[in-house]
Amino acid sequence: MMKMELRLLVSLIFILCSISMLAAEENLEHDQINLMTYIVHVKKSENVASHQSEDLHSWYHSFLPQTFPHKERMVFSYRKVASGFAVKLTPEEAKSLQEKGEIVSARPERTLELHTTHTPTFLGLKQGQGLWSDDNLGKGVIIGIIDTGIFPLHPSFNDEGMPPPPAKWKGHCEFTGGQVCNNKLIGARNLVKSAIQEPPFENFFHGTHTAAEAAGRFIEDASVFGNAKGVAAGMAPNAHLAIYKVCNDKIGCTESAILAAMDIAIEDGVDVLSLSLGLGSLPFFEDPIAIGAFAATQNGVFVSCSAANSGPGYSTLSNEAPWILTVGASTIDRKIVASAKLGNGEEYEGETLFQPKDFSQQLLPLVYPGSFGYGNQTQNQSLCLPGSLKNIDLSGKVVLCDVGNVSSIVKGQEVLNSGGIAMILANSEALGFSTFAIAHVLPAVEVSYAAGLTIKSYIKSTYNPTATLIFKGTIIGDSLAPSVVYFSSRGPSQESPGILKPDIIGPGVNILAAWAVSVDNKIPAFDIVSGTSMSCPHLSGIAALIKSSHPDWSPAAIKSAIMTTANTLNLGGIPILDQRLFPADIFATGAGHVNPVKANDPGLVYDIEPEDYVPYLCGLGYSDKEIEVIVQWKVKCSNVKSIPEAQLNYPSFSILLGSDSQYYTRTLTNVGFANSTYKVELEVPLALGMSVNPSEITFTEVNEKVSFSVEFIPQIKENRRNHTFGQGSLTWVSDRHAVRIPISVIFK
């Protein structure tokens, strides 16, 4: 009897232990499911600020429980870009951590979005001259590309004739075997955390393209499907490249990886950082790129970022911090042209990358599927969405499809599946006259919104409408270039409307550069892509050229040089236009279109030291703790004379004007000739008066600084009727230089 009771007791204990273990495992699994990566900012301690990375790592670990699985949960420890770390926590653990006095903040990380031959000539860069002379071409400068990795074997990254990297370079290469890294591609790191850590090979194709745009070598006979044929080169062909992979196709681009990449890049010794990604408008103390870029600026590193592809609406920007160069996108004067010719003889030009040589010029039946549907199906058919055309006989016909909802490639496949033999893509009103060279799956052309309306009217009013496509190949010399493309994000900045953004526009439409996989069965592979992702590395490369010429210039001085020398007219000599062919406003263009040749010799610059941003940040109303997250030193705004945004020594003015006058100062640094005199020229915004004192300034030595003041005086309110903002400029003119800054005024 006792033995039986003992067996029952043992069995009961075993069952209870098993239940307990199962419950523990279930809780563990539940915790694992609830784990999220948190970005943790810690109050900076002077005792550990100068410690080695290992000591810093141990200090960060001290904030976590002793029983905590540090090795499995700690993601990154930051040294340069932040006082803090990234760690996997449950919400409960994060809440407990935030209760510690030394913790400034702990918040879940977010995922950032990517902003996705002829351009050097278009920008005035010529081999053997100026910035492209043999002793420049970006020589000695290191550009860090924070992106999706790279295809390192592309000839755009060969190192023939290149010297070793500068002695300051501390980075390393995670590619193994052979000569993958070289004197061109000097470093490559993968910051994407995964179960199996892999080398930083490209998996989106984005990073290879952006790296080549910034600093690709000269490659002859580059083209895509035989189009845009010529010598491909980045902006700074002799600059060194360091690659930091932060994105993959499974988890996107995490902010913990981006902060880690910026942290490592600064430590490695890069001179320029290029980031073609962003998060939208955020407080700067929550924006990983703004935080990392401030640390970069403190260390003399220039940071260039894409403005985003969320235009053409106002206040759609990413990367708004004033210590970042925010880059919008413009067209170039090269187009890959085709036209839609109608049965009435009218012809409407557009673009396509697919240029068949043998397409018949015979007029074919032309249909608009949106004419056949009912209710919601009408819109689906007008957009040529997948499956929407299966009940329509399109055999042997040219099909008109509206742009939108799905890619043009998908629309083309639907047309093909339904028997269509050619496609005309009609832009939406938002796209206007912006067209793109795309490798369609059938003969096709994208035409403007206005052309699309006319073609629809022709179809509706004609008994048997007909059309054909005429393919014209690559045409150079569009007098309307540069123009602002529809997708380029616009200002004003949401987070800091007193700083004009974007800063600049640069080439971002139909850009040919290196690609990881051939799209036309030709090796080496190139592709043509559009986006502010493309305009950003153009400016990164141009910054590298300027840095090579002027190694002692600060990031703010380089930015000023780029902005104050920008073009405001297109090749036809009229103001730069937008996608509607209306004059582009200041919130689309910023200072204007980059002119690298002039930027190398600006005459004067508006310089800013890192500490100058603290009064500005206090003026934004940020708390001391929030500012400390950005600047990484102790701040007390009560002891700082805060300034309004427009008082920052920025190479533009953006003011919100009511009924009272506003008064600001700026300081100029002479980087031109020692003895020079400048006089002010004003383009005064609508309904405004302006006074500049002094109106003439004289310099007697290089690096001399002179200040001036500007008063903005509101005029009669009736003059503002039907206007929400005005724009103008202030230019200091000498016999050799014109140093222009744009002015935006929002009326309240």
Curated annotation (Swiss-Prot):
Residues 37-115 form the Inhibitor I9 domain. It comes from Medicago truncatula. GO terms for molecular function: serine-type endopeptidase activity. Residues 365-454 form the PA domain. Induction: Accumulates in mycorrhizal roots upon colonization by the arbuscular mycorrhiza (AM) fungus Glomus versiforme. This is Subtilisin-like protease. Glycans are attached at N376, N380, N405, N675, N722. Keywords: Apoplast, Glycoprotein, Hydrolase, Protease, Secreted, Serine protease, Signal. InterPro entries: PA_domain (IPR003137), Peptidase_S8/S53_dom (IPR000209), Peptidase_S8/S53_dom_sf (IPR036852), Peptidase_S8_Asp-AS (IPR023827), Peptidase_S8_subtilisin-rel (IPR015500), Peptidases_S8_3 (IPR034197), S8pro/Inhibitor_I9 (IPR010259), S8pro/Inhibitor_I9_sf (IPR037045). It holds the Pfam family Peptidase_S8. The active site is at D147, H206, S533. Required for arbuscular mycorrhiza (AM) development during AM symbiosis with AM fungi (e.g. Glomeromycota intraradices). It comes from the Eukaryota. It is found in: Secreted, Extracellular space, Apoplast. Its EC number is 3.4.21.-. CDD domains: PA_subtilisin_like, Peptidases_S8_3. Belongs to the peptidase S8 family. It is an enzyme of class 3 (hydrolase). Residues 1-24 form the signal peptide. GO terms for biological process: arbuscular mycorrhizal association; proteolysis; response to symbiotic fungus. Residues 122-600 form the Peptidase S8 domain. GO terms for cellular component: apoplast; extracellular space.
